[in-house]
Amino acid sequence: MKRYVLDEMIWPEVDAVREKIKMVVIPTGSCEQHGPNTTFATDTVRAYEFCKLLGERMGDQILVCPPVTYGLSKHHMAFPGTITIRPETLVHIYMDIVLSLHKHGFKKFLFVNGHGGNRTALTMAVAELYETHGILAYWTGMGSPFVKDMFAGIVDPDQPLYGHACEMETSQVMYLAPWAAREDRKKGEIQDSAYSRRIFKDGGCPVNWRTDASANGALGDARKATAELGKKMTEHILDEVENLILQLTEKNAEKGSKQNS
């Protein structure tokens, strides 16, 4: 099926299809270290390549935007190369993208988020878009909540920290963008700190990753990652997000913004 990716189009092509488009999809990522395992493009390229595959499934039902390549990554600033954006700036960027496209006649918008640090800004942006402008915007993740059972027996649930440059994330990169994954992958060098205590898994504390979380910037064991797992993971999440879009674009869909993490 023909995909509609803004980066690959000229304006007359957008003009010709815009009345058919039911949902604009906006990938969000980061420029953030992922240890010795995957490049700074990890979050962005995962989200963007995922959305392109979604476009191949859904054709002229969706328009895939260029990715937002920066995010909130303050907790990774101990590692050279990481770039972080202030939350209030991110909110404005997300809103301005939607407001621009809404002016061209597009009605509904879904951010597909590849970086956990963006969650708060995305939630604030979609709420403000609806409350102030009456625009229906949503966001969803593309990570472990969808595929947790798939990695049973591969991810050690008893390890103190995991979930960054790990078995799951690295597998997805190996499938979606193999150029962004290194062959000589390393296990995370977890630090003995307050951050590695279980009580903070669903909470928070001040973090300097180099001293409090991981000496090499990875959490989990990327040595177990495979492209095959990444493909299986991606196809499952594609099913979930495609179904989400179909639900959100039904004629009788209720008004109001909704966030799915």
What role is predicted for each listed range?
Residues 1-110, 116-261:
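Extended, histidine- and acidic-residue-enriched regions that form the cofactor-binding/catalytic faces
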